C-alpha cells in the first residue's frame, strides 16, 4: 500500500507533464497555466521536484504568452539553466524555439535568431530533429520581422515546409504554409499563396477550433477575395 501511495503523485505528475505538452502544442495558454499550477501544488504537497525544470519552463511560457512577459521570459531562462545544469538534453531544441518565438513577439529579433541557431545546433548534436520545422519557421518569422532580405525569409519558410513534409508533421506543415502564404500575399502572389495553403488546410477533418486552423481559414478567405 505504501508503495502505491508513493507512486500515485508521481503518476499524476507524469500525466500533467503530457497534458502540458499537448496543450502548449495547440497554444492553449490558460490550460498550460492551470496544469503547471496543479503541478506546483503537488510538488509542494509531496516534497518532490519531478519535472521541475520542464514544468517551470512551460509555466514561464504561459506567463510570457499572457500579461507577465518579463517574468515569464525570466522563468523560461532560469528553467533552461536548471535543465542545462542537470544535463537534461531532451526538450532543449523545442524550448529554445519557444523562447525564440517569445523574443520575436517582444521585438528582440537578434536574440530570437541566435536562439534558433542554437536550437538547430542542439538538434543536430542530440539527434532531436522533430521540431526542426518549427525552428526554421520561427527563424523565418524572426528574419522577416527584423527586416532581412525577403529571399532569406522565404528560404527559412520553404525549409520549414520541406522538413515538415519529410517528417509527415501535418500541423507543422500547416504553420509553415500559413507563414509562407502571408509572405507571398504581401508580395502580391495571392494565387500562389492560396494554391499552397488550400490543399494543406483541406487535409484536416477535425481541430477546427484550434488557433492554427482558424488562422488558415481566415487567411484562405482573404486570399479568395
Region locations from a protein language model:
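Helix-coil-helix junctions within alpha-helical repeat/solenoid scaffolds
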Residues: 1-225
Amino acid at each position: 500500500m505504501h508503495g502505491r501511495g508513493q507512486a500515485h503523485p508521481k503518476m499524476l505528475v507524469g500525466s500533467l507533464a503530457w497534458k502540458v505538452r499537448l496543450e502548449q502544442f495547440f497554444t492553449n495558454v490558460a490550460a498550460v497555466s492551470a496544469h503547471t499550477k496543479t503541478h506546483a501544488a503537488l510538488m509542494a504537497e509531496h516534497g518532490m521536484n519531478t519535472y521541475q525544470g520542464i514544468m517551470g519552463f512551460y509555466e514561464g511560457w504561459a506567463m510570457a504568452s499572457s500579461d507577465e512577459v518579463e517574468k515569464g521570459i525570466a522563468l523560461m531562462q532560469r528553467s533552461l539553466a536548471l535543465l542545462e545544469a542537470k544535463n537534461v538534453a531532451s526538450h532543449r531544441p523545442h524550448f529554445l524555439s519557444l523562447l525564440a518565438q517569445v523574443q520575436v513577439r517582444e521585438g528582440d529579433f537578434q536574440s530570437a535568431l541566435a536562439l534558433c541557431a542554437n536550437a538547430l545546433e542542439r538538434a543536430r548534436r542530440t539527434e532531436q530533429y522533430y521540431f526542426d520545422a518549427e525552428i526554421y519557421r520561427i527563424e523565418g518569422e524572426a528574419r522577416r520581422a527584423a527586416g532581412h532580405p525577403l529571399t532569406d525569409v522565404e528560404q527559412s519558410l520553404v525549409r520549414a515546409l520541406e522538413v515538415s513534409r519529410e517528417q509527415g508533421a501535418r500541423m507543422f506543415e500547416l504553420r509553415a504554409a500559413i507563414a509562407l502564404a502571408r509572405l507571398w500575399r504581401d508580395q502580391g502572389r495571392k494565387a500562389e499563396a492560396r494554391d499552397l495553403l488550400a490543399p494543406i488546410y483541406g487535409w484536416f477533418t477535425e481541430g477546427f477550433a484550434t488557433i492554427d486552423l482558424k488562422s488558415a481559414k481566415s487567411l484562405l478567405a482573404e486570399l479568395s477575395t
